[in-house]
Amino acid sequence: MELVFIRHGQSEWNAKNLFTGWRDVKLSEQGLAEAAAAGKKLKENGYEFDIAFTSVLTRAIKTCNIVLEESDQLFVPQIKTWRLNERHYGQLQGLDKKQTAEQYGDEQVRIWRRSYDTLPPLLDKDDEFSAHKDRRYAHLPADVVPDGENLKVTLERVLPFWEDQIAPAILSGKRVLVAAHGNSLRALAKHIEGISDEDIMGLEIPTGQPLVYKLDDNLKVIEKFYL
């Protein structure tokens, strides 16, 4: 059994080195090209999908669409879920990473970005960019919508969707594509690879590169590689 992850192509805020999180930004020109190249590469290597899962953020949805279009599979059903959203960066969202490091120190920013269980400063629910004011999440209970997350909380958000939707799809024989975000994919990788809380800090998933997992019947990783 195989599972393919792809982190969205470079976004406009990736290019500007800004914290993005749940803020909805578009792909950059480079990001569009990365997604198209990924789709072509998947086609060249014979990858076909029966179902695709993505987030409710534009950069991941667009990447998913482009990948499927460039691999002649735009007909493949897509399921969009907030549970695959990027980690919510709280008050850091929209801030320049370099300027934030100058203000708080490199080590503090590194911990905010990479630590498994350290939360960023939480965003006020009344902030104009709060997810509580976004109709994408209007169906969710207020106490479920995050104001800031670490990777641990992100995994707790993503895991129910893995167990309820993604894993059963794989086990039923479906060929699955997950087009999501750096941290939601890191959370899933931590779970399926059994990565420790410490080692996950060093895992980086590049934009726009298909990551293939070969899995056994228990969804244990036999092999992983980038195309």
Swiss-Prot record:
Covalent S-S links between cysteines: none
Pathway: Carbohydrate degradation; glycolysis; pyruvate from D-glyceraldehyde 3-phosphate: step 3/5
Record site feature (Transition state stabilizer), residues: 181
InterPro entries found in the cross-reference section: His_Pase_superF_clade-1, His_PPase_superfam, Phosphogly_mut1
Any one of the GO BP annotations: glycolytic process
UniProt-annotated catalytic positions: 8 (tele-phosphohistidine intermediate), 86 (proton donor/acceptor)
SUPFAM superfamilies named in the record: Phosphoglycerate mutase-like
Reactions catalysed, as given in the entry: (2R)-2-phosphoglycerate = (2R)-3-phosphoglycerate
Residue ranges of the TM segments: none
Swiss-Prot/TrEMBL keywords: Gluconeogenesis, Glycolysis, Isomerase
Enzymatic class: isomerase
CDD domains reported for this sequence: HP_PGM_like
GO function terms (MF aspect): phosphoglycerate mutase activity
Binding site for substrate: 7-14, 20-21, 59, 86-89, 97, 113-114, 182-183
Record-listed E.C. numbers: 5.4.2.11
Cited function: Catalyzes the interconversion of 2-phosphoglycerate and 3-phosphoglycerate.
Family named by the database record: Belongs to the phosphoglycerate mutase family. BPG-dependent PGAM subfamily.
SUBUNIT field: Homodimer.
Protein name: 2,3-bisphosphoglycerate-dependent phosphoglycerate mutase
Organism: Neisseria meningitidis serogroup B (strain ATCC BAA-335 / MC58)
